[in-house]
């Protein structure tokens, strides 16, 4: 249903933490102009944990309104409360989002049966395409491939963002689910391999700052052209590393500030990128000719 380079969009903020609506609209246009295939808003990179519910919903609406159908908009609507996730997913549907991204419930660490019933309840309650999001390093809870296969039988669960670097797990999901569910990488460093084994794209942090390059890498990888994909991927590796020098989205927001696209705002408990990483990130941006 969705494919290619899907940017995990940051949520621009002013230095005092207020949301920067002009900056958000500017980013949407930047991605449309530079070949991004879809926008994923208010996910991990979009700082959803520190947004108020009304802010969360308004960000979705602003992105949808600015996109004007020029590319798909996927809204992060996951929560560790099933009821809250249903409410956010319904709000995203009403706002005009094309699909929703639902993270595995964090902190309360449900069983596999609890995970199955959680996602099943949301899918049955809200008729919008839904993409599962497994990121065990953040949630302390792992959605196993066997549970993904059960969920793939639900018609509006259409994909999974697998944020691990485990290529064998990606293959297992594809084998268990077949064409019932699309696989997306949630780790930039593993994205190329995920697509070469049959994944449909990546939900990418790096695409925030290098949208053309990530789009080009996805295009050739989806065509099965390993040589061309590896050439771009190898070139991007220093940028992948620099963008995770501190926890995401700290480095990518600083990079976008350096590029002149957003203000230097981030909400506590996250903080602005430590000065010791500034030159590392500048060098990676210069190497990709993003900065002069």
From Swiss-Prot:
Site (described: Part of a proton relay during catalysis): 44, 107
Any one GO molecular-function label of the UniProt entry: 4-hydroxy-tetrahydrodipicolinate synthase activity
GO biological process: diaminopimelate biosynthetic process; lysine biosynthetic process via diaminopimelate
Annotated keywords: Amino-acid biosynthesis, Cytoplasm, Diaminopimelate biosynthesis, Lyase, Lysine biosynthesis, Schiff base
Pathway info: Amino-acid biosynthesis; L-lysine biosynthesis via DAP pathway; (S)-tetrahydrodipicolinate from L-aspartate: step 3/4
EC number from the UniProt entry: 4.3.3.7
Annotated Pfam families: DHDPS
InterPro entries tied to this protein: Aldolase_TIM, DapA, DapA-like, Schiff_base-form_aldolases_AS, Schiff_base-form_aldolases_CS
Record localization: Cytoplasm
Family matches, as SMART domains: DHDPS
Catalytic activity from the UniProt record: L-aspartate 4-semialdehyde + pyruvate = (2S,4S)-4-hydroxy-2,3,4,5-tetrahydrodipicolinate + H2O + H(+)
Positions annotated as active site in the UniProt record: 133 (proton donor/acceptor), 161 (schiff-base intermediate with substrate)
Chief site of localization: cytoplasm
Name of the top EC class for this enzyme: lyase
Source organism superkingdom: Bacteria
Residues at which pyruvate binds: 45, 203
HAMAP family per UniProt: DapA
Family indicated by similarity: Belongs to the DapA family.
Assembly description: Homotetramer; dimer of dimers.
Protein name: 4-hydroxy-tetrahydrodipicolinate synthase
Organism the protein comes from: Nitrosococcus oceani (strain ATCC 19707 / BCRC 17464 / JCM 30415 / NCIMB 11848 / C-107)
């Amino acid at each position: 249903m969705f494919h290619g380079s899907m940017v995990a969009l940051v949520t621009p903020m002013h230095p005092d933490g207020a949301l920067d609506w002009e900056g958000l609209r500017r980013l949407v246009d930047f991605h449309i102009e530079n070949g991004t295939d879809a926008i994923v808003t208010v996910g991990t990179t979009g700082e959803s944990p520190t947004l108020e519910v009304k802010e969360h919903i308004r960000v979705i609406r602003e992105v949808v309104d600015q996109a004007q159908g020029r590319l798909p908009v996927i809204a992060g609507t996951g929560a560790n409360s099933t009821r809250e996730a249903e409410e956010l997913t319904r709000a995203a549907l009403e706002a005009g989002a094309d699909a929703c991204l639902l993270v595995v419930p964090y902190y309360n660490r449900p069983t596999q049966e609890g995970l199955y019933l959680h996602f099943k309840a949301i899918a049955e309650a809200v008729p919008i395409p839904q993409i599962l999001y497994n990121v065990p390093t953040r949630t302390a809870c792992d959605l196993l491939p066997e549970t993904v296969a059960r969920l793939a039988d639900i018609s509006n669960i259409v994909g999974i963002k697998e944020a691990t670097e485990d290529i064998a797990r990606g293959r297992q999901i594809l084998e268990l689910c077949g064409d019932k569910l699309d696989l997306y990488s949630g780790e930039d460093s593993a994205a190329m391999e995920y697509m070469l084994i049959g994944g449909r794209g990546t939900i990418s942090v790096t695409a925030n700052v290098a949208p053309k390059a990530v789009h080009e890498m996805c295009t050739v990888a989806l065509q099965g052209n390993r040589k061309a994909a590896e050439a771009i991927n190898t070139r991007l590796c220093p940028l992948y590393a620099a963008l995770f020098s501190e926890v995401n989205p700290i480095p990518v927001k600083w990079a976008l500030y350096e590029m002149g696209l957003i203000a230097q705002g981030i909400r506590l408990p996250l903080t602005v990128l430590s000065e010791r990483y500034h030159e590392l990130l500048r060098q990676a941006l210069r190497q990709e000719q993003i900065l002069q």
